[in-house]
């Protein structure tokens, strides 16, 4: 009797499961399409025909990011349909701060053993994020790597490319003393600070994923899995009618580390904390974890997802526009002169 030879499936890689997965995600991918997309899912590369006639001097802007340990929360709760939104948000929010309209997106999904239904839930979220951002999901990679991840675990990475007119690039160089700082509210923790949040909630407080968080009236899962807000359409709306001199996406590093990334030499940001009180989730984390103030503002977004430096005479109109766009926003401070060697963000 001839002994049966090994197959790839015997080694833990199920090509049939991969084909099932592709079939499940096709409608999600199609929902994100733009007229410039000239390829279908399954090709070796995604094709996007940029209409250069729309631009005088187009510059492509790229970004890549992940979701971090927020994925641990999704696995604990067995809820996988929102982390894809986070993935898109972390990438497109990074390029919109330079004024770039996101054009297309690609994802990387890695796991030990592919569960087609779970993977499809993730891609459904990616599709939703792309729709919110107005970009097309034109490709991706699904890597099944047996023995590399624990059962049920996976990781995500995202990649986006956008376009901006060279003359319209926002790089902070036009920020001047007296500019007002407009903060646009976050939807929650977004996708940063989860290692500390998990330590506080699950270790220090001893709560479970389905426990109701004190003072919030919602479960840990609901609070921690709130998707990251995508600011693309809001920012593009503002840029059509207002001068915006600099934008900071408040991600890992918080206000203290991200605002300086867009400040020119000689400028610092004065942030008035009474103008943007900590939302309840952040207050809970600070109190339960005895987290010092500066550590909070270096770890979490503390309720502010985007900071815009704008001319003083346009700040109030920008707030009115943001309110009309259903965004909570505040004037959280101003730009002041910074002496050499001084901190570039001052919390007052």
UniProtKB/Swiss-Prot annotation:
Top-level taxon in the UniProt lineage: Bacteria
Database matches in InterPro entries: PurM-like_C_dom, PurM-like_C_sf, PurM-like_N, PurM-like_N_sf, PurM_cligase
Keywords noted in UniProt: ATP-binding, Cytoplasm, Ligase, Nucleotide-binding, Purine biosynthesis
Catalytic activity line of the entry: 2-formamido-N(1)-(5-O-phospho-beta-D-ribosyl)acetamidine + ATP = 5-amino-1-(5-phospho-beta-D-ribosyl)imidazole + ADP + phosphate + H(+)
EC number: 6.3.3.1
Location(s) in or outside the cell: Cytoplasm
Similarity comment: family membership: Belongs to the AIR synthase family.
Protein name: Phosphoribosylformylglycinamidine cyclo-ligase
Organism: Geobacter sulfurreducens (strain ATCC 51573 / DSM 12127 / PCA)
Gene name of this polypeptide: purM
């Amino acid at each position: 009797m001839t002994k049966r030879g090994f197959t790839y499936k015997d080694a833990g890689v199920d090509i049939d499961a991969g084909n099932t997965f592709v079939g499940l995600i096709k409608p999600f991918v199609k929902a994100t399409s733009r007229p410039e997309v000239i390829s279908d899912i399954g090709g070796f590369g995604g094709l996007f025909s940029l209409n250069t006639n729309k631009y005088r001097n187009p510059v492509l802007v790229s970004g890549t990011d992940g979701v971090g340990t927020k994925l641990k929360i999704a696995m604990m709760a067995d809820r996988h349909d929102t982390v894809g939104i986070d993935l898109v948000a972390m990438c497109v929010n990074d390029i919109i701060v330079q004024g770039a309209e996101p054009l297309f997106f690609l994802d990387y999904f890695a796991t030990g053993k592919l569960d087609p239904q779970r993977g499809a839930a993730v891609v459904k979220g990616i599709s939703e994020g792309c729709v919110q951002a107005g970009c097309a999901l034109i490709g991706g990679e699904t890597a099944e790597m047996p023995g590399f991840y624990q059962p049920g675990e996976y990781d995500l990475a995202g990649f986006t490319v956008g376009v901006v007119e060279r003359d319209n690039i926002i790089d902070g160089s036009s920020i001047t003393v007296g500019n007002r700082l407009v903060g646009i509210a976050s939807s929650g923790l977004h996708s940063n600070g989860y290692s500390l949040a998990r330590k506080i909630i699950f270790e220090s407080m001893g709560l479970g994923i389905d426990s109701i968080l004190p003072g919030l009236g919602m479960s840990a899962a609901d609070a921690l899995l709130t998707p990251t807000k995508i600011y693309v359409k809001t920012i593009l709306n503002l840029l059509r009618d207002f001068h915006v001199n600099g934008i900071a996406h408040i991600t890992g590093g918080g206000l203290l580390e991200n605002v300086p990334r867009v400040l020119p030499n000689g400028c610092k940001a004065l942030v008035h904390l009474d103008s943007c009180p900590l939302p309840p989730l952040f207050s809970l984390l600070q109190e339960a974890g005895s987290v010092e103030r500066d550590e909070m503002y270096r770890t979490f977004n503390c309720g502010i997802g985007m900071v815009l430096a704008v001319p003083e005479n346009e700040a109030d109109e920008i707030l009115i526009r943001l309110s009309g766009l259903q965004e909570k926003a505040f004037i959280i401070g101003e730009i002041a002169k910074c002496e050499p060697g001084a901190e570039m963000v001052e919390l007052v």
